[in-house]
Amino acid sequence: MVPSGVRTGRWVAAARAAQRRPRVDSLGQPPSPESASTRAALYVHWPYCEKRCSYCNFNKYIPRGVEEGTVRNCLVTEARTLLRLSGVQRVESVFFGGGTPSLASPHTVAAVLEAVAQEVYLPADSEVTLEANPTSAPGPRLAAFGAAGVNRLSIGLQSLDDAELQLLGRTHSASDALRTLAEARLLFPGRVSVDLMLGLPAQKVEPWLQQLQKLLYHCDDHLSLYQLTLERGTSLFAQVQQGTLPAPDPDLAAEMYQEGRTVLRDAGFRQYEVSNFARNGALSTHNWTYWQCGQYLGIGPGAHGRFVPQGTGGHTREARIQTLEPDNWMKEVTLFGHGTRKCVRLGKLELLEEVLAMGLRTDVGVTHQHWQQFEPQLTLWDVFGASKEVEELLAQGLLLLDYRGLRCSWEGLAVLDSLLLTLLPQLQEAWQHRPSSPVSGG
């Protein structure tokens, strides 16, 4: 039965049938170079929220009213325009983020998905994720999103402590979060992710670990741990600056992270990325595209994208940012078909730096095969094999460089930022002194 108010098209109907099939974990191996150039992920930004959380500096707005029909039409238009511009033939995943996309109507989600499926091949079993806040996603509404084509949820739970939730400016309680999580697991079994924050002001290790243990009793097969970052311009930043709140203790945050990842490993979760943990093959296809430096298109106000504009004969990957403010973005989409505000061509070294920094965030790291897709002349051995600094990191057991490629050890993954302080300059030096060779496409 399809919930009322959800218009279904051909793709949405096929997607609902595909949701009943078992998931197959095929991540970890990069696609062939040919397919990589014709595939992309799609990010859709819904910029509106009910209120601004105290820690958040994302591009979001609290409007008096939203003309959703206009927003929907602009999202559809921009998706069509950028898909044609990119020349991609297949979209592997779609992620509705924000903002609070669970405030959008399921009809808007379905309209975007149908538009994508009309432009390119969107497999019926493609991962389609929706970020949801507990207060804006009761069970019937979640079911309506499922009927619209969503097959994976990412719930912004953040904490199971009501005092911490209040500090963060969240609109839900711990009981609200657990109720939404239970309803989501019934509707999307094996496809529900939750976020848990660490390193809050005055937060202690043991109470936080108790939260994590409690969450393990209720959660599904995917969990993300995020350390609080105090962002300038947020309420939380101001309170710490004024001395109203104590500054977060970085040593305690590091201890929480180390203890937390150990707890999750013991519970059968694979830490497949610095902040992300999965069991039973429930890795995020969409985020994996980011970490593997795959192409992705960003639509909606302030969305980011990275792709080669093959549709207009382009051969160089571009970093694109859409216009931030929703009303201005809609005006530009209406006039030009898209609201791209900034477009920067990525140099070859810039792209390789991203391949290295993003790839090392994963437990797979950067394989030789994957690296060669971006740089067929200069190998990982050429870049890192003769470096004394890298040799020292290998001896310390923080890095591994072998027949598989370059990757962090379990210990190294926890200190990746410090490792990159050695690895990125080494890449830059190797690039500067590389032998002359024909420049390959990016």
UniProtKB/Swiss-Prot annotation:
S-adenosyl-L-methionine 1 binds at residues 43, 98, 131. Its cofactor is [4Fe-4S] cluster. S-adenosyl-L-methionine 2 binds at residues 99-100, 158, 170, 195. One of its GO terms (cellular component) is mitochondrion. Coiled coil: none annotated. It comes from the Eukaryota. Residues 1-17 form a transit peptide. Keywords: 4Fe-4S, Chaperone, Heme, Iron, Iron-sulfur, Metal-binding, Mitochondrion, S-adenosyl-L-methionine, Transit peptide. The keyword tRNA processing does not apply. Residues 34-270 form the Radical SAM core domain. [4Fe-4S] cluster binds at residues 49, 53, 56. It is found in: Mitochondrion. InterPro entries: Aldolase_TIM (IPR013785), Coproporphyrinogen-III_oxidase (IPR034505), Elp3/MiaA/NifB-like_rSAM (IPR006638), HemN_C (IPR010723), HemW-like (IPR004559), rSAM (IPR007197). GO terms for biological process: porphyrin-containing compound biosynthetic process. Might carry two S-adenosyl-L-methionine binding sites with only one binding to the iron-sulfur cluster. Belongs to the anaerobic coproporphyrinogen-III oxidase family. HemW subfamily. This is Radical S-adenosyl methionine domain-containing protein 1, mitochondrial. It comes from Mus musculus. The lineage of its organism: Eukaryota, Metazoa, Chordata, Craniata, Vertebrata.
